[in-house]
Regions:
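Terminal domain-initiation and capping elements
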Residues: 1-77
Length: 77
C-alpha cells in the first residue's frame, strides 16, 4: 500500500508560504517547492510525496499542517 501526501490550495496561504513550508519541512529544493505550490494553486492539489509506510506520511502531513497548510494523506489507487 502506498500513502500519498497532498497539499491543497486554500484562501489563507500564499504561494510563497506554501513553497517556504515545503522547503522547511521536507528540505525540498526551492525549484521543486515552487512547482508543487504552483500545481496546488492551479489545480487545487499537489502530491508532495508517496510513502510505503503510513507513519511517515502522517508525520509529514502533521508537520505541514503545523505550518498552517491544508495537507492530507490518501491511499494511492
Amino acid at each position: 500500500m502506498t500513502w500519498r501526501v497532498l497539499v491543497h490550495n486554500d484562501a489563507i496561504n500564499s504561494f510563497a508560504a506554501v513553497a517556504y513550508a515545503l522547503v522547511r519541512v521536507l528540505s525540498m529544493p526551492v525549484e521543486h517547492a515552487a512547482a508543487a505550490a504552483r500545481q496546488a494553486y492551479e489545480s487545487g492539489v499537489a502530491e508532495i510525496g508517496a510513502y510505503t509506510e503510513r507513519e511517515p506520511a502522517e508525520a509529514i502531513t502533521a508537520r505541514l499542517q503545523a505550518f498552517g497548510l491544508n495537507a492530507s494523506i490518501e491511499v494511492a489507487a
